[in-house]
A protein has these predicted regions:
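Conserved NAD+-utilizing ADP-ribose enzyme module
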Residues: 1-2, 8-30, 55, 67-77, ...
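Short aromatic-glycine-(Arg/Gly/Cys) micro-motifs in beta-strand/loop hairpins
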Residues: 24-52
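A short linear-motif detector with a strong N-terminal bias
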Residues: 36-38, 57-61, 109-111
Length: 175
């Protein structure tokens, strides 16, 4: 299974990546609306599902989604990763449901309904599959330095965010 991790930390080949000590939910940019959204997601998580969005390790199924996040998240890197022997997949969901939820932040009934779609693993028109793991292993460093990241993001913006037109995308998709 090919997967991609976007992270600000520097890792080496064969390093194990674990969830961060602090959550993205603890950052200063994580406002009250986002906290409410994550609270509803937590409340709507089906019984028996053991996914913790606050402390889990998010990994993308598609390189194009990893590239998009890398060009948004400053000082980030992209790693091709594989599961360790004892890796646990907690959930696979379409991250776009979370983005859609942001449009209904003041409508708790709609938020609960959309959270159900996320936890059921339903897809949107153009899904962005995120997988929540306990750990993964670095199998390849795709973006490991600021220069490569800057070149990628420059090309990404020149192509108006059209990932499929990026040379970098095709070069790394084939390898």
């Amino acid at each position: 299974m090919t997967m991609y991790r976007v992270d600000k930390k520097q890792y080496e080949l064969n390093d194990q990546i674990l969830p961060n000590d602090s959550s993205f939910q603890d950052s200063a940019s994580f406002n009250q609306d986002k906290q409410n959204l994550e609270k509803i997601l937590s409340e709507e998580m089906p019984n028996g599902k053991n996914a913790d969005r606050k402390t889990g390790l998010f990994v993308f199924a598609d390189l194009s989604d990893a590239i998009r996040l890398c060009c948004i998240m400053t000082n980030s890197r992209i790693y091709k990763v594989v599961p360790a022997e004892d890796t646990i997949l907690f959930h696979r969901g379409d991250m776009n449901w979370i983005e859609i939820m942001n449009q209904f932040i003041n409508d708790n009934n709609t938020l609960k309904h959309l959270a159900g779609f996320y936890w059921q693993g339903l897809k949107t028109y153009k899904p962005c599959w995120e997988m929540l793991f306990n750990k993964v292993i670095v199998s390849k460093i795709i973006i490991g330095d600021d220069s490569t990241r800057s070149n990628l993001c420059r090309e990404y913006h020149e192509m108006a965010g059209n990932i499929e037109r990026l040379n970098f995308y095709y070069e790394n998709l084939i390898k």
